Amino acid sequence: MRTLFIYPEFPKTFWSYEKILELVNRKVLLPPLGLVTVAALLPQHWEMKLVDRNVREVTAAEWDWAELVVISGMIVQKADMAVQIARAKERGLPVAVGGPFASSTPDAPELDLADFKVLDEGEITLPLFIDAIERGEAGGRFSAEGEKPDVTSTPVPRFDLLELEAYDSMSVQFSRGCPFQCEFCDIIVLYGRKPRTKTPEQLIAELQRLYDLGWRRSIFLVDDNFIGNKRNAKLLLPALKTWQIEHGYPFSFATEASVDLAADDELMEMMAECRFDSVFLGIETPDAASLETAKKLQNTRSSLEEAVDRIGSYGIRVMAGFIIGFDGEKSGAGDRIVEFVSRTGIPAAMMGMLQALPNTGLWHRLEKEGRLIQEKDAAKGVNQTNLLNFVPTRPIREIANEYVDAFCRLYEPHAYIDRVTHYYLKMGLPRWQQYVPAAFGKAAPPSWTDVRALLIVIWRQGLQRDTRWRFWRSLLKVARHNPGVLEQFLVVLAHNEHFLEYRGIVTREIGDQLAALPAEEPVSAPQRELQRA
């Protein structure tokens, strides 16, 4: 069976980083890990090709070659997903769809033309799909019916199908699921609250496969909470450290984790020694009442500012997500987020207005309260250019204006340089470097592509723009007081090349949506009494 995998195009988002990727001559930040995992779960005698539409178009020759088209994507990719399904059907090809969008909203109109809907986790539903194909069936819908697979038998993804040089980072997955119950989160809906992990041997085999394919850059562990199962994470990390030492630390790692990481010094030390250089935290808001409303109680048990500082002291850069628009939220939430980010110095602070995602606790509550203003199948997903999809407890325009103002202030060029400088002056030194001499001696020098990118950033921020004096003062300050993090400091300064452009996108698109709101559109719901858990 000649199988063509297609990964739909993403809209521009906070994480698309186009301007940064242009500097380093790459197309996309991350590959479609889900599709290459599906490829490994299908019969290996099938012929396979993969096209990531974020990298390039599907060629006529590839359409002609295909006997089956497999498409997977997230809610934010649904528009292009529909286009690719239609193109396949125009050519008379059978289409199978799956992934987060199909699993959460299988009856969405964008999926109407698909022949097969392979829902939930593929370890369970792909065998059903394969059986249907082998029986000659022309369509079907396959669901796990709530069952969650044991991922210790999941094979190494087919990384060989990827155009590796197009990507800035690779992706691997160690765990699925999260033990917490944040009301707005769809991860526990898709993967459950009991984190399931691969074995250390499995993950090491995946890294070895990437290494054998020539990969030598960063790797993102896509786990939604890498420390959801701390015991198993601590079993993995010693094996990962040994592998890194034996191979001369070819990879740096980034991942996502809950804030309680900061309370576990042993875990942070182990991650730092494996060369984890960044972690994304869902901080959401500094307002404790809003955290309680959202059932994100793990963020209320200790100081969030201290958590950011403790993680940074291990040489692990904190990235963080923030949300505006919670029920009962008081005016000025945007200001409070900006103040928190400025005090902690978090360089990459992702902001967005709250979205009720299909099937989440938030969705069901708002549906019961009659406050949803969007059908389930019309959900847009989490993006920084979407208004809230429900009636909030304060005016939509007030929330949206606070959001745009806060986002623009966070990435104002002078403020950004000051914040990044503040962060890197207190950043801990990378712990892993002490093990490199015992392995391979000095680390490999940076490539010419990376050097050229940094020179362009220095030209723009240090000479061309009115940030020049602030740039050089900050550079000299970090070089003098914390030289071990100077390279990282420059790389993170470069990120604002993307955020500068994205500020304009956020302002324009949110403004257009506000202008399009009809006069009779409900702008706020009655204040609801905050319920303390």
For the regions a protein language model found, what residue spans apply to each?
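Acidic, low-complexity intrinsically disordered segments
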Residues: 1-215
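Radical SAM enzyme core and accessory elements
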Residues: 2-5, 47, 62, 377-378, ...
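Conserved beta-strand positions
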Residues: 5, 71, 221-223, 281, ...
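Amphipathic alpha-helical segments that form well-ordered structural scaffolds
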Residues: 37-41, 239, 405
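A C-terminal junction/extension of Radical SAM enzymes
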Residues: 51-55, 145-157, 317, 329-352, ...
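Structural recognition of alpha->loop->beta junctions
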Residues: 108-128, 270-278, 338-351
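Radical SAM [4Fe-4S] cluster-binding motif and immediate context
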Residues: 155-319, 324-339, 367-368, 375
